[in-house]
């Protein structure tokens, strides 16, 4: 069970997706499912840990570390994860098995340049597509356990100020195959996964890697 104190400070918290409070709930749900913190704990020295390079919330909600790909750290994100991240999904599936009926049809995941996203996709099957609409350049990588930069940029923040570079904010979980990607009118980068992909950059000077 998860209990949340509704008195005092927590009574004024914003619990909407993208907030640190919503991320905290996901973190605590991770504990109820058996997930542990990935960092060293001197009280439990024999507990398995992740390498420092992977100990980041962009990889697992069970981390306490907010950092970009170059290691610049802060104390939160400008927009927090709204789903378990790729290592969380992999660990849960290792313990309980994958949900093979979740998004098993032909699904389209829609994004825009005005939206803000921070999520990992688990898709069990079908012929699926990433559909991005907008003029801002975007970067879409269809390979599992890889991140994309899509929609409004998400930053690590230190006391409310953006630091470092934007972080990948849309990830594809291990075992998920997304076949197609269609982007907007900006100068986009699309990277395929070798699964008979349709990669369409529409307008703009695009780069497509297959």
Where are the language model's segments positioned?
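Short pre-active-site segment immediately N-terminal to the catalytic Zn-binding motif
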Residues: 6-25
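Surface beta-strand/loop "capping" patches
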Residues: 99-129
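Acidic/polar low-complexity surface segments
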Residues: 100, 139-180, 210
